[in-house]
Amino acid sequence: MGNKQTIFTEEQLDNYQDCTFFNKKDILKLHARFYELAPNLVPMDYRKSPIVHVPMSLIIQMPELRENPFKERIVEAFSEDGEGNLTFNDFVDMFSVLCESAPRELKANYAFKIYDFNTDNFICKEDLEMTLARLTKSELEEDEVVLVCDKVIEEADLDGDGKLGFADFEDMIAKAPDFLSTFHIRI
């Protein structure tokens, strides 16, 4: 009796703790956030593991993502269905990877997916152009964009193939002291 939570079984909570950087309290807080996004869709009882997809259009309205120029790409990177719709597991994964406790390697893996717009497992000049357009709100002149993209490829392309593989990207991220402090969101 009493106020014991019944949103998840103890086993489910233990599994979430094992697979994320969160404790039980954080997981319950995340469920509350997920529920707030779509109260008519998200159940309060997850003990039977319902599969509910919250549409990307609702996810990107969260304060943590609303102003981010990569909000759709972030949500798509964590979406199992590839359309940006998130299950609770996807939602927890997104917050776990973007939390301050997640290691640089894990963050780099997802950052690479986010910046790989054409999903060819490389960051090519076109991907860099799209990244710059989002970061600068398309305020750079075309010749400036070309110059910046060429310089990034020149500096970061370790194997000289004209594009950045994950190893190139990871090396570049390792040299960016502010990557960890900027690639995160709080619950």
Swiss-Prot record:
Which residue positions does the secretion signal occupy? none
Q: What Gene3D superfamilies does the record tag this protein with?
A: EF-hand
Q: Which GO terms describe its molecular function?
A: calcium ion binding; integrin binding; magnesium ion binding; protein homodimerization activity; protein-containing complex binding
Predominant location: cytoplasm
Instruction: Output the Gene Ontology cellular-component terms.
Output: cuticular plate; cytoplasm; cytosol; muscle tendon junction; neuromuscular junction; photoreceptor inner segment; photoreceptor outer segment; sarcolemma
Annotated ranges, domain EF-hand: 66-101, 103-138, 144-179
Q: Where does Ca(2+) 2 bind?
A: 157, 159, 161, 163, 168
The answer to keyword Magnesium applying to this record is yes
Task: Give the function comment from the record.
Answer: Calcium- and integrin-binding protein that plays a role in intracellular calcium homeostasis. Acts as an auxiliary subunit of the sensory mechanoelectrical transduction (MET) channel in hair cells. Essential for mechanoelectrical transduction (MET) currents in auditory hair cells and thereby required for hearing. Regulates the function of hair cell mechanotransduction by controlling the distribution of transmembrane channel-like proteins TMC1 and TMC2, and by regulating the function of the MET channels in hair cells.
The name this protein goes by in its record: Calcium and integrin-binding family member 2
